Amino acid sequence: MSSQPQLALEASQAASSTRDGVIPAVNYWIGAVEAVYRASAQGKNSHMEIVSKAQSELEYIEKQIDQLQVAAANNQEARQQLENLHKRIDSLRRQMAGRLTAWERTELARHPMRPYPLDYIERIFPNFSEIHGDRGFADDPALIGGMAQFHGREVMVIGTQKGRDTKQRVYRNFGQPNPEGYRKALRLMKFAEKWGRPVVTLVDVVGAYPGLGAEERGQAEAIARNLREMARLRVPYVAVITGEGGSGGALAIAVADRVLMMENSIYSVISVEGCASIMWRDSTKKEIAAEALKITAKDNLELGIADELIPEPAGGAHHDYDAAASAVADALEKHLSQLEKLPVETLLAERYKKFRNMAQYFQVVS
Protein backbone atom coordinates (compact mmCIF):
# COMPACT_ATOMS: atom_id res chain seq x y z
CA MET A 1 0.00 0.00 0.00
CA SER A 2 1.37 3.43 -0.88
CA SER A 3 2.00 5.97 1.87
CA GLN A 4 -0.76 8.19 0.47
CA PRO A 5 -3.84 6.28 -0.76
CA GLN A 6 -5.63 7.29 -3.97
CA LEU A 7 -8.39 9.28 -2.27
CA ALA A 8 -5.73 11.41 -0.57
CA LEU A 9 -4.79 12.78 -3.98
CA GLU A 10 -8.41 13.72 -4.62
CA ALA A 11 -8.54 15.42 -1.23
CA SER A 12 -5.40 17.40 -1.99
CA GLN A 13 -6.97 18.62 -5.21
CA ALA A 14 -10.09 19.59 -3.27
CA ALA A 15 -7.96 21.49 -0.76
CA SER A 16 -6.57 23.75 -3.45
CA SER A 17 -10.08 24.81 -4.45
CA THR A 18 -11.43 25.44 -0.93
CA ARG A 19 -11.13 28.63 1.01
CA ASP A 20 -9.96 27.16 4.31
CA GLY A 21 -8.00 24.35 2.69
CA VAL A 22 -7.24 21.45 4.99
CA ILE A 23 -10.40 20.68 6.99
CA PRO A 24 -12.77 20.87 3.98
CA ALA A 25 -10.32 18.65 2.12
CA VAL A 26 -10.42 16.01 4.86
CA ASN A 27 -14.21 16.35 4.92
CA TYR A 28 -14.27 15.75 1.17
CA TRP A 29 -11.90 12.83 1.62
CA ILE A 30 -14.16 11.06 4.12
CA GLY A 31 -17.13 11.72 1.86
CA ALA A 32 -15.29 10.01 -0.99
CA VAL A 33 -14.70 6.92 1.17
CA GLU A 34 -18.38 6.91 2.17
CA ALA A 35 -19.42 7.10 -1.48
CA VAL A 36 -17.17 4.21 -2.44
CA TYR A 37 -18.50 2.13 0.43
CA ARG A 38 -22.13 2.94 -0.45
CA ALA A 39 -21.41 1.67 -3.95
CA SER A 40 -20.23 -1.63 -2.47
CA ALA A 41 -23.37 -1.82 -0.31
CA GLN A 42 -25.42 -1.65 -3.51
CA GLY A 43 -23.46 -4.55 -4.94
CA LYS A 44 -21.56 -2.53 -7.51
CA ASN A 45 -18.16 -3.77 -6.36
CA SER A 46 -16.64 -6.63 -4.36
CA HIS A 47 -17.49 -5.98 -0.70
CA MET A 48 -14.25 -7.50 0.58
CA GLU A 49 -12.08 -5.40 -1.73
CA ILE A 50 -14.00 -2.25 -0.81
CA VAL A 51 -13.75 -2.89 2.93
CA SER A 52 -10.00 -3.42 2.64
CA LYS A 53 -9.59 -0.25 0.58
CA ALA A 54 -11.86 1.80 2.85
CA GLN A 55 -10.04 0.63 6.00
CA SER A 56 -6.70 1.66 4.48
CA GLU A 57 -8.08 5.05 3.52
CA LEU A 58 -9.62 5.62 6.96
CA GLU A 59 -6.43 4.69 8.79
CA TYR A 60 -4.52 7.20 6.70
CA ILE A 61 -7.18 9.87 7.24
CA GLU A 62 -7.09 9.37 11.01
CA LYS A 63 -3.34 9.88 11.10
CA GLN A 64 -3.75 13.14 9.20
CA ILE A 65 -6.53 14.30 11.55
CA ASP A 66 -4.37 13.51 14.60
CA GLN A 67 -1.58 15.65 13.15
CA LEU A 68 -4.02 18.45 12.39
CA GLN A 69 -5.40 18.36 15.95
CA VAL A 70 -1.92 19.03 17.30
CA ALA A 71 -1.49 21.92 14.88
CA ALA A 72 -4.93 23.31 15.80
CA ALA A 73 -4.39 23.11 19.57
CA ASN A 74 -5.23 26.80 20.03
CA ASN A 75 -8.13 26.91 17.59
CA GLN A 76 -11.34 25.74 19.30
CA GLU A 77 -13.45 25.84 16.13
CA ALA A 78 -10.93 23.81 14.14
CA ARG A 79 -10.59 21.28 16.96
CA GLN A 80 -14.37 20.82 17.06
CA GLN A 81 -14.50 20.32 13.30
CA LEU A 82 -11.76 17.70 13.49
CA GLU A 83 -13.57 15.94 16.35
CA ASN A 84 -16.69 15.78 14.19
CA LEU A 85 -14.63 14.23 11.40
CA HIS A 86 -13.41 11.58 13.87
CA LYS A 87 -17.05 10.79 14.67
CA ARG A 88 -17.86 10.41 10.99
CA ILE A 89 -15.02 7.93 10.65
CA ASP A 90 -16.29 5.95 13.65
CA SER A 91 -19.79 5.90 12.17
CA LEU A 92 -18.51 4.64 8.82
CA ARG A 93 -16.43 1.96 10.53
CA ARG A 94 -19.49 0.76 12.43
CA GLN A 95 -21.47 0.58 9.18
CA MET A 96 -18.74 -1.57 7.68
CA ALA A 97 -18.55 -3.76 10.81
CA GLY A 98 -22.24 -4.52 10.49
CA ARG A 99 -21.69 -6.05 7.05
CA LEU A 100 -18.44 -7.93 7.64
CA THR A 101 -18.36 -11.52 6.44
CA ALA A 102 -17.11 -14.40 8.59
CA TRP A 103 -13.81 -14.36 6.71
CA GLU A 104 -13.38 -10.62 7.20
CA ARG A 105 -13.91 -11.07 10.94
CA THR A 106 -11.34 -13.87 10.84
CA GLU A 107 -8.86 -11.41 9.35
CA LEU A 108 -9.67 -8.92 12.12
CA ALA A 109 -9.23 -11.63 14.76
CA ARG A 110 -5.77 -12.30 13.31
CA HIS A 111 -4.80 -8.64 12.86
CA PRO A 112 -1.11 -8.32 13.83
CA MET A 113 -1.80 -5.19 15.90
CA ARG A 114 -4.79 -6.63 17.75
CA PRO A 115 -4.33 -6.46 21.55
CA TYR A 116 -2.99 -9.70 23.01
CA PRO A 117 -3.61 -11.01 26.54
CA LEU A 118 -0.61 -9.14 28.01
CA ASP A 119 -2.05 -5.89 26.62
CA TYR A 120 -5.31 -6.57 28.45
CA ILE A 121 -3.52 -7.65 31.62
CA GLU A 122 -1.51 -4.41 31.64
CA ARG A 123 -4.73 -2.35 31.48
CA ILE A 124 -7.17 -4.43 33.53
CA PHE A 125 -5.22 -6.34 36.17
CA PRO A 126 -2.88 -4.24 38.35
CA ASN A 127 -0.15 -5.93 40.38
CA PHE A 128 -0.01 -8.91 38.02
CA SER A 129 2.59 -11.36 39.33
CA GLU A 130 3.50 -14.01 36.78
CA ILE A 131 4.02 -17.62 37.87
CA HIS A 132 6.30 -19.85 35.79
CA GLY A 133 6.69 -23.55 35.09
CA ASP A 134 4.62 -26.72 35.22
CA ARG A 135 6.78 -28.37 37.92
CA GLY A 136 7.25 -31.30 35.59
CA PHE A 137 9.18 -30.36 32.47
CA ALA A 138 9.59 -26.66 31.68
CA ASP A 139 8.07 -23.21 31.50
CA ASP A 140 6.10 -22.47 28.33
CA PRO A 141 6.28 -18.78 27.28
CA ALA A 142 3.29 -19.28 24.94
CA LEU A 143 1.05 -19.55 27.99
CA ILE A 144 1.24 -16.93 30.73
CA GLY A 145 -0.48 -16.71 34.08
CA GLY A 146 -0.34 -15.34 37.58
CA MET A 147 -2.16 -13.65 40.42
CA ALA A 148 -3.53 -10.13 40.03
CA GLN A 149 -6.02 -7.63 41.43
CA PHE A 150 -9.34 -6.97 39.73
CA HIS A 151 -11.81 -4.46 41.16
CA GLY A 152 -10.85 -5.19 44.74
CA ARG A 153 -10.57 -8.97 44.45
CA GLU A 154 -7.65 -11.30 43.83
CA VAL A 155 -7.95 -13.39 40.67
CA MET A 156 -5.86 -15.89 38.74
CA VAL A 157 -5.31 -14.64 35.19
CA ILE A 158 -4.18 -17.04 32.46
CA GLY A 159 -3.68 -16.32 28.76
CA THR A 160 -1.97 -17.28 25.54
CA GLN A 161 0.58 -14.87 24.07
CA LYS A 162 1.65 -14.71 20.41
CA GLY A 163 4.36 -12.05 20.30
CA ARG A 164 4.63 -8.92 18.16
CA ASP A 165 7.96 -9.15 16.32
CA THR A 166 9.90 -12.11 14.94
CA LYS A 167 12.02 -12.56 18.06
CA GLN A 168 8.99 -12.53 20.36
CA ARG A 169 6.98 -14.80 18.07
CA VAL A 170 9.73 -17.40 18.10
CA TYR A 171 10.09 -17.05 21.88
CA ARG A 172 6.33 -17.47 22.34
CA ASN A 173 6.18 -20.28 19.75
CA PHE A 174 3.71 -18.15 17.77
CA GLY A 175 1.26 -18.48 20.65
CA GLN A 176 0.90 -22.25 20.32
CA PRO A 177 1.23 -23.89 23.76
CA ASN A 178 3.11 -27.12 24.37
CA PRO A 179 1.76 -29.67 26.88
CA GLU A 180 3.85 -28.06 29.63
CA GLY A 181 1.92 -24.84 28.95
CA TYR A 182 -1.42 -26.54 29.53
CA ARG A 183 -0.05 -28.29 32.60
CA LYS A 184 1.11 -24.93 33.91
CA ALA A 185 -2.39 -23.54 33.31
CA LEU A 186 -3.91 -26.41 35.27
CA ARG A 187 -1.40 -25.92 38.07
CA LEU A 188 -2.46 -22.26 38.32
CA MET A 189 -6.16 -23.14 38.26
CA LYS A 190 -5.69 -25.63 41.10
CA PHE A 191 -3.71 -23.00 43.00
CA ALA A 192 -6.62 -20.56 42.58
CA GLU A 193 -9.06 -23.25 43.70
CA LYS A 194 -7.02 -23.94 46.85
CA TRP A 195 -7.20 -20.28 47.89
CA GLY A 196 -10.74 -19.64 46.66
CA ARG A 197 -9.79 -17.18 43.91
CA PRO A 198 -11.78 -16.73 40.66
CA VAL A 199 -10.10 -17.75 37.41
CA VAL A 200 -10.04 -15.57 34.28
CA THR A 201 -8.59 -16.84 31.01
CA LEU A 202 -7.82 -14.69 27.95
CA VAL A 203 -7.77 -16.86 24.84
CA ASP A 204 -6.07 -15.95 21.56
CA VAL A 205 -4.58 -19.11 20.09
CA VAL A 206 -4.54 -20.66 16.64
CA GLY A 207 -4.27 -24.09 18.28
CA ALA A 208 -2.12 -26.31 20.47
CA TYR A 209 1.39 -26.91 19.12
CA PRO A 210 1.31 -30.04 16.88
CA GLY A 211 5.06 -30.76 16.88
CA LEU A 212 6.60 -34.19 17.42
CA GLY A 213 8.07 -33.24 20.81
CA ALA A 214 4.71 -31.95 22.01
CA GLU A 215 3.02 -35.20 21.00
CA GLU A 216 5.72 -37.27 22.69
CA ARG A 217 5.27 -35.31 25.92
CA GLY A 218 1.52 -35.95 25.90
CA GLN A 219 -0.23 -33.02 24.25
CA ALA A 220 -3.54 -34.88 23.96
CA GLU A 221 -3.37 -36.08 27.57
CA ALA A 222 -2.60 -32.58 28.85
CA ILE A 223 -5.59 -31.10 27.02
CA ALA A 224 -7.91 -33.92 28.08
CA ARG A 225 -6.87 -33.61 31.72
CA ASN A 226 -7.51 -29.86 31.62
CA LEU A 227 -11.01 -30.42 30.23
CA ARG A 228 -11.85 -32.80 33.04
CA GLU A 229 -10.39 -30.68 35.82
CA MET A 230 -11.90 -27.41 34.59
CA ALA A 231 -15.34 -29.02 34.58
CA ARG A 232 -15.04 -29.56 38.34
CA LEU A 233 -13.07 -26.48 39.36
CA ARG A 234 -14.71 -25.18 42.56
CA VAL A 235 -14.29 -21.44 41.93
CA PRO A 236 -15.95 -18.94 39.54
CA TYR A 237 -14.37 -19.14 36.10
CA VAL A 238 -14.75 -16.75 33.15
CA ALA A 239 -13.07 -17.23 29.76
CA VAL A 240 -12.74 -14.44 27.19
CA ILE A 241 -11.97 -15.20 23.53
CA THR A 242 -10.04 -12.07 22.55
CA GLY A 243 -8.85 -13.09 19.08
CA GLU A 244 -8.59 -16.60 17.70
CA GLY A 245 -10.17 -19.50 19.55
CA GLY A 246 -8.56 -22.43 17.81
CA SER A 247 -9.98 -25.87 18.50
CA GLY A 248 -8.74 -27.93 21.47
CA GLY A 249 -5.90 -25.50 22.02
CA ALA A 250 -8.47 -22.89 23.03
CA LEU A 251 -10.92 -25.22 24.75
CA ALA A 252 -8.11 -26.45 27.02
CA ILE A 253 -8.34 -23.14 28.91
CA ALA A 254 -11.99 -22.29 28.28
CA VAL A 255 -14.31 -24.81 29.99
CA ALA A 256 -15.71 -21.94 32.04
CA ASP A 257 -18.91 -20.83 33.75
CA ARG A 258 -19.10 -17.96 31.28
CA VAL A 259 -17.53 -17.81 27.81
CA LEU A 260 -17.33 -14.26 26.48
CA MET A 261 -16.25 -13.32 22.96
CA MET A 262 -14.94 -10.07 21.58
CA GLU A 263 -17.05 -8.79 18.70
CA ASN A 264 -14.44 -9.68 16.06
CA SER A 265 -13.08 -12.84 17.64
CA ILE A 266 -13.60 -16.36 16.29
CA TYR A 267 -14.07 -19.77 17.94
CA SER A 268 -13.86 -22.92 15.86
CA VAL A 269 -13.06 -26.64 15.84
CA ILE A 270 -10.56 -26.14 13.01
CA SER A 271 -8.93 -23.30 11.09
CA VAL A 272 -10.88 -22.12 8.07
CA GLU A 273 -7.95 -23.01 5.79
CA GLY A 274 -7.77 -26.51 7.30
CA CYS A 275 -11.49 -27.00 6.82
CA ALA A 276 -11.31 -25.83 3.20
CA SER A 277 -8.42 -28.21 2.50
CA ILE A 278 -10.32 -31.18 3.95
CA MET A 279 -13.82 -30.47 2.64
CA TRP A 280 -13.03 -28.99 -0.78
CA ARG A 281 -9.39 -30.07 -1.24
CA ASP A 282 -8.74 -26.38 -1.86
CA SER A 283 -7.45 -23.98 0.81
CA THR A 284 -8.58 -21.00 -1.29
CA LYS A 285 -12.18 -21.88 -0.38
CA LYS A 286 -11.53 -20.32 3.02
CA GLU A 287 -14.33 -17.76 2.67
CA ILE A 288 -16.91 -20.50 2.11
CA ALA A 289 -15.44 -22.52 4.98
CA ALA A 290 -15.59 -19.53 7.33
CA GLU A 291 -19.32 -19.13 6.71
CA ALA A 292 -20.01 -22.87 7.03
CA LEU A 293 -18.11 -23.27 10.30
CA LYS A 294 -20.17 -20.64 12.15
CA ILE A 295 -17.06 -19.24 13.81
CA THR A 296 -17.99 -15.63 14.57
CA ALA A 297 -18.95 -14.29 17.99
CA LYS A 298 -22.52 -13.75 16.76
CA ASP A 299 -22.72 -17.35 15.53
CA ASN A 300 -21.36 -18.74 18.79
CA LEU A 301 -23.76 -16.61 20.81
CA GLU A 302 -26.73 -17.88 18.79
CA LEU A 303 -25.54 -21.48 19.19
CA GLY A 304 -25.28 -21.13 22.96
CA ILE A 305 -21.52 -21.62 23.07
CA ALA A 306 -20.76 -18.01 23.99
CA ASP A 307 -22.63 -16.19 26.75
CA GLU A 308 -21.94 -12.60 25.71
CA LEU A 309 -20.56 -10.64 22.79
CA ILE A 310 -18.23 -7.84 23.94
CA PRO A 311 -18.40 -4.79 21.62
CA GLU A 312 -15.16 -3.48 20.16
CA PRO A 313 -14.10 0.06 19.24
CA ALA A 314 -15.11 1.16 15.75
CA GLY A 315 -12.99 -0.70 13.21
CA GLY A 316 -11.72 -3.31 15.67
CA ALA A 317 -9.91 -3.62 18.99
CA HIS A 318 -6.56 -2.72 17.39
CA HIS A 319 -7.76 0.87 16.94
CA ASP A 320 -8.13 1.56 20.67
CA TYR A 321 -6.53 -0.78 23.22
CA ASP A 322 -7.87 1.19 26.19
CA ALA A 323 -11.47 1.13 24.99
CA ALA A 324 -11.25 -2.58 24.20
CA ALA A 325 -9.79 -3.32 27.65
CA SER A 326 -12.48 -1.22 29.32
CA ALA A 327 -15.21 -3.23 27.56
CA VAL A 328 -13.60 -6.51 28.66
CA ALA A 329 -13.27 -5.25 32.25
CA ASP A 330 -16.95 -4.26 32.37
CA ALA A 331 -18.05 -7.68 31.10
CA LEU A 332 -15.76 -9.49 33.54
CA GLU A 333 -17.05 -7.50 36.50
CA LYS A 334 -20.66 -8.23 35.56
CA HIS A 335 -20.19 -11.97 35.25
CA LEU A 336 -17.82 -12.45 38.18
CA SER A 337 -20.22 -10.56 40.43
CA GLN A 338 -23.02 -12.90 39.38
CA LEU A 339 -20.96 -16.08 39.77
CA GLU A 340 -19.55 -15.16 43.17
CA LYS A 341 -23.08 -15.19 44.61
CA LEU A 342 -23.69 -18.83 43.63
CA PRO A 343 -23.02 -21.80 45.94
CA VAL A 344 -20.19 -24.03 44.71
CA GLU A 345 -22.48 -26.97 43.96
CA THR A 346 -24.76 -24.76 41.87
CA LEU A 347 -21.72 -23.39 40.04
CA LEU A 348 -20.54 -26.89 39.15
CA ALA A 349 -23.98 -28.14 38.14
CA GLU A 350 -24.62 -25.17 35.83
CA ARG A 351 -21.17 -25.39 34.25
CA TYR A 352 -21.66 -29.10 33.55
CA LYS A 353 -25.13 -28.48 32.13
CA LYS A 354 -23.86 -25.62 29.95
CA PHE A 355 -21.33 -27.80 28.13
CA ARG A 356 -23.56 -30.89 27.97
CA ASN A 357 -26.23 -28.83 26.20
CA MET A 358 -23.91 -27.45 23.50
CA ALA A 359 -23.90 -30.38 21.09
CA GLN A 360 -26.55 -31.01 18.48
CA TYR A 361 -26.85 -34.34 16.75
CA PHE A 362 -29.16 -36.26 14.45
CA GLN A 363 -29.89 -39.95 14.79
CA VAL A 364 -30.24 -41.80 11.51
CA VAL A 365 -32.19 -45.05 11.62
CA SER A 366 -31.54 -47.32 8.66
Language-model segments: what does each one mean?
Residues 98, 123, 127, 137-139, ...:
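Glycine-rich beta-alpha loop segments
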Residues 106-109, 170-172, 315-318:
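Short hinge/gating elements
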Residues 61, 101, 157, 204, ...:
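Terminal peptide-recognition signature
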Residues 1, 29, 33-37, 43-154, ...:
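Intrinsically disordered, low-complexity segments enriched in small/flexible residues
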Residues 49, 203-333, 337, 341:
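Conserved catalytic cores of soluble enzyme domains
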Residues 3, 10, 15-16, 23, ...:
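Short, low-complexity intrinsically disordered segments enriched in A/P/G/S/L with frequent Arg
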Residues 56, 112-119, 139, 143, ...:
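Charged, alpha-helix-enriched surfaces in structured cytosolic catalytic cores
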